[in-house]
Amino acid sequence: MACSRFEYVKSFEQDDSILPNVWIVIRIDGKKFHKFSKTHDFEKPNDENALNVMNAAATAVMQEFRDIVLAYGQSDEYSFVFRKETAAFKRRSAKLLTYVTSLFSSSYVMQWSKWMNLPLAYAPCFDGRVVLYPSEQNLKDYLSWRQADVHVNNLYNTAFWKLVLEKGLTNQQAEAKLRGTFSADKNELLFQEFGINYNNLPAMYRKGTILLRKRVILGEKSRQAVVPLHEDLISSQFWKEHTEILGKYVPGTYDAPQTFPRLVEMQINGKDDNEAEEPQNLAGTS
Protein backbone atom coordinates (compact mmCIF):
# COMPACT_ATOMS: atom_id res chain seq x y z
CA MET A 1 0.00 0.00 0.00
CA ALA A 2 1.37 3.39 -1.00
CA CYS A 3 2.17 5.78 1.82
CA SER A 4 0.05 8.91 2.05
CA ARG A 5 -0.90 11.55 4.59
CA PHE A 6 -4.08 9.58 5.26
CA GLU A 7 -2.27 6.45 6.38
CA TYR A 8 -2.40 7.56 10.02
CA VAL A 9 -5.98 6.20 10.20
CA LYS A 10 -4.51 2.70 10.47
CA SER A 11 -3.45 3.58 14.02
CA PHE A 12 -7.10 3.35 15.07
CA GLU A 13 -7.28 -0.36 14.27
CA GLN A 14 -7.32 -2.64 17.28
CA ASP A 15 -4.84 -5.44 17.74
CA ASP A 16 -7.02 -8.54 17.99
CA SER A 17 -4.27 -11.16 17.80
CA ILE A 18 -5.19 -14.27 19.76
CA LEU A 19 -2.90 -15.44 22.54
CA PRO A 20 -0.50 -18.22 21.54
CA ASN A 21 -0.82 -21.82 22.66
CA VAL A 22 -4.59 -21.87 23.24
CA TRP A 23 -7.33 -23.83 21.50
CA ILE A 24 -9.39 -21.57 19.27
CA VAL A 25 -13.06 -22.46 18.89
CA ILE A 26 -15.33 -20.61 16.50
CA ARG A 27 -19.02 -21.33 16.98
CA ILE A 28 -21.58 -20.21 14.44
CA ASP A 29 -25.33 -20.08 15.14
CA GLY A 30 -28.30 -19.63 12.86
CA LYS A 31 -30.07 -16.29 13.16
CA LYS A 32 -33.90 -16.48 13.28
CA PHE A 33 -33.73 -20.12 12.24
CA HIS A 34 -37.17 -20.84 13.69
CA LYS A 35 -38.65 -18.66 10.95
CA PHE A 36 -36.23 -20.07 8.36
CA SER A 37 -37.12 -23.69 9.17
CA LYS A 38 -40.85 -22.92 9.12
CA THR A 39 -40.60 -21.14 5.77
CA HIS A 40 -38.77 -24.11 4.27
CA ASP A 41 -41.04 -26.70 5.89
CA PHE A 42 -38.37 -28.57 7.87
CA GLU A 43 -39.56 -31.92 9.16
CA LYS A 44 -40.17 -32.01 12.93
CA PRO A 45 -38.46 -32.76 15.25
CA ASN A 46 -35.48 -33.44 12.95
CA ASP A 47 -34.97 -32.91 9.24
CA GLU A 48 -32.18 -35.20 8.08
CA ASN A 49 -31.58 -33.35 4.82
CA ALA A 50 -31.47 -29.95 6.53
CA LEU A 51 -28.93 -31.28 9.02
CA ASN A 52 -26.85 -32.58 6.14
CA VAL A 53 -26.83 -29.15 4.53
CA MET A 54 -25.23 -27.93 7.76
CA ASN A 55 -22.77 -30.84 7.68
CA ALA A 56 -21.86 -30.16 4.05
CA ALA A 57 -21.30 -26.46 4.73
CA ALA A 58 -19.09 -27.32 7.70
CA THR A 59 -17.16 -29.76 5.53
CA ALA A 60 -16.43 -26.93 3.09
CA VAL A 61 -15.01 -24.88 5.96
CA MET A 62 -12.77 -27.75 7.05
CA GLN A 63 -11.55 -28.23 3.49
CA GLU A 64 -10.51 -24.57 3.42
CA PHE A 65 -8.86 -24.55 6.85
CA ARG A 66 -6.49 -27.47 7.29
CA ASP A 67 -5.81 -26.29 10.84
CA ILE A 68 -9.35 -27.19 11.94
CA VAL A 69 -8.92 -30.55 13.66
CA LEU A 70 -12.55 -31.14 14.58
CA ALA A 71 -15.97 -29.65 13.90
CA TYR A 72 -19.10 -30.43 15.87
CA GLY A 73 -22.63 -29.59 14.81
CA GLN A 74 -26.21 -29.87 15.95
CA SER A 75 -29.45 -28.17 14.95
CA ASP A 76 -28.47 -24.73 13.57
CA GLU A 77 -25.02 -24.44 15.15
CA TYR A 78 -21.49 -25.62 14.38
CA SER A 79 -18.25 -25.39 16.38
CA PHE A 80 -14.84 -25.42 14.68
CA VAL A 81 -11.74 -26.31 16.69
CA PHE A 82 -8.41 -24.93 15.46
CA ARG A 83 -5.20 -26.58 16.58
CA LYS A 84 -3.30 -24.64 19.23
CA GLU A 85 -0.37 -23.88 16.93
CA THR A 86 -2.37 -22.44 14.04
CA ALA A 87 -0.93 -19.34 12.40
CA ALA A 88 -3.86 -18.80 10.04
CA PHE A 89 -4.46 -15.08 9.43
CA LYS A 90 -1.68 -14.44 11.97
CA ARG A 91 -4.21 -15.58 14.63
CA ARG A 92 -6.27 -12.42 14.15
CA SER A 93 -9.63 -13.01 15.80
CA ALA A 94 -11.74 -10.84 13.49
CA LYS A 95 -10.22 -12.35 10.35
CA LEU A 96 -10.78 -15.93 11.51
CA LEU A 97 -14.31 -15.26 12.72
CA THR A 98 -15.51 -13.41 9.65
CA TYR A 99 -13.90 -15.83 7.21
CA VAL A 100 -15.38 -18.92 8.89
CA THR A 101 -18.83 -17.38 9.31
CA SER A 102 -19.05 -16.01 5.77
CA LEU A 103 -17.64 -19.18 4.22
CA PHE A 104 -20.10 -21.32 6.16
CA SER A 105 -23.03 -19.09 5.15
CA SER A 106 -22.15 -19.07 1.45
CA SER A 107 -21.45 -22.82 1.47
CA TYR A 108 -24.85 -23.44 3.07
CA VAL A 109 -26.50 -21.66 0.14
CA MET A 110 -24.38 -23.55 -2.41
CA GLN A 111 -25.14 -26.93 -0.80
CA TRP A 112 -28.87 -26.37 -0.40
CA SER A 113 -30.07 -27.76 -3.73
CA LYS A 114 -27.93 -30.89 -3.34
CA TRP A 115 -29.90 -31.97 -0.27
CA MET A 116 -33.25 -30.18 -0.20
CA ASN A 117 -36.29 -30.57 -2.46
CA LEU A 118 -37.68 -27.08 -1.89
CA PRO A 119 -36.02 -24.05 -3.52
CA LEU A 120 -34.27 -21.66 -1.17
CA ALA A 121 -36.73 -18.85 -0.44
CA TYR A 122 -34.11 -16.53 1.02
CA ALA A 123 -30.53 -16.73 2.24
CA PRO A 124 -29.95 -17.83 5.84
CA CYS A 125 -27.91 -15.76 8.26
CA PHE A 126 -25.40 -16.94 10.86
CA ASP A 127 -23.61 -15.13 13.64
CA GLY A 128 -20.43 -16.31 15.30
CA ARG A 129 -18.12 -15.99 18.27
CA VAL A 130 -14.54 -16.85 19.15
CA VAL A 131 -13.83 -18.66 22.42
CA LEU A 132 -10.37 -19.62 23.70
CA TYR A 133 -9.62 -22.68 25.82
CA PRO A 134 -6.21 -22.97 27.52
CA SER A 135 -6.24 -26.70 28.30
CA GLU A 136 -7.28 -29.95 26.67
CA GLN A 137 -9.73 -30.58 29.51
CA ASN A 138 -11.35 -27.19 28.93
CA LEU A 139 -11.79 -28.07 25.27
CA LYS A 140 -13.22 -31.51 26.06
CA ASP A 141 -15.64 -29.98 28.55
CA TYR A 142 -16.80 -27.44 25.98
CA LEU A 143 -17.57 -30.15 23.43
CA SER A 144 -19.20 -32.29 26.12
CA TRP A 145 -21.42 -29.33 27.01
CA ARG A 146 -22.54 -28.96 23.40
CA GLN A 147 -23.27 -32.68 23.07
CA ALA A 148 -25.18 -32.76 26.35
CA ASP A 149 -27.24 -29.89 24.93
CA VAL A 150 -28.15 -32.09 21.96
CA HIS A 151 -29.51 -34.81 24.24
CA VAL A 152 -31.60 -32.46 26.37
CA ASN A 153 -33.06 -30.58 23.40
CA ASN A 154 -33.66 -33.57 21.15
CA LEU A 155 -35.36 -35.65 23.84
CA TYR A 156 -37.71 -32.77 24.64
CA ASN A 157 -38.38 -31.96 20.98
CA THR A 158 -39.04 -35.60 20.09
CA ALA A 159 -41.61 -35.94 22.88
CA PHE A 160 -43.11 -32.51 22.12
CA TRP A 161 -43.66 -33.08 18.42
CA LYS A 162 -45.00 -36.60 18.93
CA LEU A 163 -47.65 -35.12 21.23
CA VAL A 164 -48.49 -32.39 18.71
CA LEU A 165 -48.34 -34.34 15.45
CA GLU A 166 -49.68 -37.72 16.56
CA LYS A 167 -51.79 -37.00 19.65
CA GLY A 168 -53.23 -33.77 18.29
CA LEU A 169 -52.24 -31.61 21.26
CA THR A 170 -51.72 -27.89 20.74
CA ASN A 171 -48.26 -26.46 21.32
CA GLN A 172 -49.43 -25.04 24.65
CA GLN A 173 -50.92 -28.38 25.75
CA ALA A 174 -47.75 -30.26 24.84
CA GLU A 175 -45.62 -27.74 26.73
CA ALA A 176 -47.86 -28.11 29.79
CA LYS A 177 -47.67 -31.91 29.66
CA LEU A 178 -43.87 -31.88 29.53
CA ARG A 179 -43.37 -29.10 32.05
CA GLY A 180 -41.39 -30.28 35.08
CA THR A 181 -40.60 -33.70 33.60
CA PHE A 182 -37.18 -35.36 33.77
CA SER A 183 -35.38 -37.33 31.08
CA ALA A 184 -36.69 -40.61 32.48
CA ASP A 185 -40.25 -39.28 32.28
CA LYS A 186 -39.87 -38.30 28.63
CA ASN A 187 -38.29 -41.66 27.78
CA GLU A 188 -41.20 -43.40 29.47
CA LEU A 189 -43.74 -41.24 27.63
CA LEU A 190 -42.16 -42.02 24.26
CA PHE A 191 -42.11 -45.74 24.97
CA GLN A 192 -45.55 -46.10 26.58
CA GLU A 193 -47.52 -43.80 24.27
CA PHE A 194 -45.65 -44.13 20.99
CA GLY A 195 -43.67 -47.38 21.25
CA ILE A 196 -40.40 -45.52 20.76
CA ASN A 197 -37.14 -46.54 22.39
CA TYR A 198 -35.27 -43.24 22.36
CA ASN A 199 -31.89 -45.01 22.19
CA ASN A 200 -32.90 -46.55 18.86
CA LEU A 201 -33.41 -43.19 17.14
CA PRO A 202 -30.72 -42.16 14.61
CA ALA A 203 -27.47 -41.27 16.37
CA MET A 204 -27.18 -38.02 14.40
CA TYR A 205 -30.32 -36.76 16.13
CA ARG A 206 -29.24 -37.91 19.59
CA LYS A 207 -25.52 -37.09 19.47
CA GLY A 208 -25.01 -34.49 16.76
CA THR A 209 -22.34 -34.74 14.07
CA ILE A 210 -18.58 -34.82 14.57
CA LEU A 211 -16.48 -34.03 11.51
CA LEU A 212 -12.91 -35.34 11.41
CA ARG A 213 -10.32 -35.50 8.68
CA LYS A 214 -9.53 -39.16 8.01
CA ARG A 215 -7.73 -41.29 5.47
CA VAL A 216 -10.28 -43.23 3.43
CA ILE A 217 -9.16 -46.56 1.99
CA LEU A 218 -10.18 -47.03 -1.65
CA GLY A 219 -8.96 -50.44 -2.76
CA GLU A 220 -5.17 -50.24 -2.96
CA LYS A 221 -5.20 -46.45 -2.68
CA SER A 222 -6.25 -44.00 -0.01
CA ARG A 223 -7.12 -40.33 0.20
CA GLN A 224 -8.11 -37.83 2.83
CA ALA A 225 -11.70 -36.76 3.37
CA VAL A 226 -13.76 -35.04 6.03
CA VAL A 227 -15.93 -37.78 7.49
CA PRO A 228 -19.07 -37.53 9.67
CA LEU A 229 -19.23 -39.46 12.93
CA HIS A 230 -22.06 -39.71 15.44
CA GLU A 231 -20.25 -40.87 18.55
CA ASP A 232 -20.16 -40.15 22.26
CA LEU A 233 -17.41 -37.55 22.57
CA ILE A 234 -18.16 -37.13 26.28
CA SER A 235 -16.56 -40.52 26.93
CA SER A 236 -12.81 -40.96 27.25
CA GLN A 237 -12.98 -43.75 24.67
CA PHE A 238 -13.65 -41.26 21.88
CA TRP A 239 -10.40 -39.41 22.57
CA LYS A 240 -8.45 -42.67 22.79
CA GLU A 241 -9.73 -43.74 19.38
CA HIS A 242 -9.04 -40.38 17.71
CA THR A 243 -5.70 -39.40 19.21
CA GLU A 244 -4.79 -37.19 16.25
CA ILE A 245 -7.16 -34.46 17.49
CA LEU A 246 -5.07 -33.51 20.50
CA GLY A 247 -1.73 -34.94 19.43
CA LYS A 248 0.43 -34.64 16.35
CA TYR A 249 -2.17 -34.02 13.70
CA VAL A 250 -1.87 -36.95 11.30
CA PRO A 251 -5.33 -38.11 10.16
CA GLY A 252 -6.15 -41.66 11.19
CA THR A 253 -7.78 -44.30 9.01
CA TYR A 254 -11.53 -44.08 8.54
CA ASP A 255 -13.38 -47.07 9.99
CA ALA A 256 -15.91 -46.91 7.19
CA PRO A 257 -19.39 -48.44 7.34
CA GLN A 258 -20.45 -50.88 4.62
CA THR A 259 -21.68 -47.96 2.51
CA PHE A 260 -19.94 -44.59 2.52
CA PRO A 261 -22.06 -41.71 3.78
CA ARG A 262 -23.17 -39.47 0.92
CA LEU A 263 -21.07 -36.63 2.36
CA VAL A 264 -17.93 -38.75 1.93
CA GLU A 265 -18.94 -40.00 -1.52
CA MET A 266 -19.37 -36.41 -2.73
CA GLN A 267 -15.80 -35.61 -1.70
CA ILE A 268 -14.33 -38.76 -3.22
CA ASN A 269 -16.14 -38.32 -6.52
CA GLY A 270 -15.93 -34.54 -6.69
CA LYS A 271 -12.17 -33.91 -6.51
CA ASP A 272 -9.03 -35.31 -8.01
CA ASP A 273 -6.29 -36.65 -5.75
CA ASN A 274 -4.01 -33.63 -6.12
CA GLU A 275 -6.71 -31.18 -5.11
CA ALA A 276 -7.69 -33.28 -2.11
CA GLU A 277 -4.17 -33.47 -0.74
CA GLU A 278 -3.10 -29.88 -1.39
CA PRO A 279 -2.25 -28.20 1.93
CA GLN A 280 -3.72 -24.84 2.81
CA ASN A 281 -1.59 -22.00 4.09
CA LEU A 282 -3.12 -18.84 5.50
CA ALA A 283 -0.29 -18.07 7.89
CA GLY A 284 0.90 -15.01 6.04
CA THR A 285 -2.52 -13.65 5.15
CA SER A 286 -3.32 -10.31 6.69
Swiss-Prot record:
GTP binds at D29, G30, K31, K32, F33, H34, S75, D76. Its cofactor is Mg(2+). Keywords: GTP-binding, Magnesium, Metal-binding, Nucleotide-binding, Nucleotidyltransferase, Transferase, tRNA processing. It comes from the Eukaryota. Mg(2+) 1 binds at D29, G30, D76. Adds a GMP to the 5'-end of tRNA(His) after transcription and RNase P cleavage. This is Probable tRNA(His) guanylyltransferase. It comes from Drosophila melanogaster (Fruit fly). The gene is Thg.
